[in-house]
Amino acid sequence: MTENRGRIGAGEDTAAVVAALHELIAGQAVADWQAVITAVQELDHVGAGPVGYWGMSMGCGLGVPLLAAEPRIRAAVLGLLGVHGLAEAAARVTVPVRFLLQWDDDLVPRDQGLALFDALASAEKTLHANPGKHGEIPGFEMDSSLRFLARHLG
């Protein structure tokens, strides 16, 4: 993390630094998440029902590659991230997606967030934009996101 802060402090593009970090982590995280899904679905009290994904910011950066690779995930709530480094994986995401964007995000440029939403190949996707900075998601969006997942997984 200190190295990344130094790169950003030296003037390197923040989006490129964050995208490189996500790519590094996602390489292992996708396999780890797939193993977790398999293990949980093997539990007698869980079974092989549909799976949902909820990920904001870094969770979105890891979630887009996971959604592109994992057919057991049937719906997702994503957001607070831009397209940099994710366009190819986003083009393979076809499940229903609810995308949250903070209009005044101080970390993710609005046009980059909108570009990620646009890059998602999902036929059923909705964009939910709210005033506020990165991470200041209104409580009603959390409640509504849970209803979205319940509707698609239930």
Model-inferred region functions:
Residues 114, 118-135:
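Catalytic histidine neighborhood in serine/cysteine hydrolases
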Residues 1-10:
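Conserved alpha/beta-hydrolase
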Residues 93, 99-101, 105:
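Short beta-strand/loop motif that positions the catalytic acidic residue
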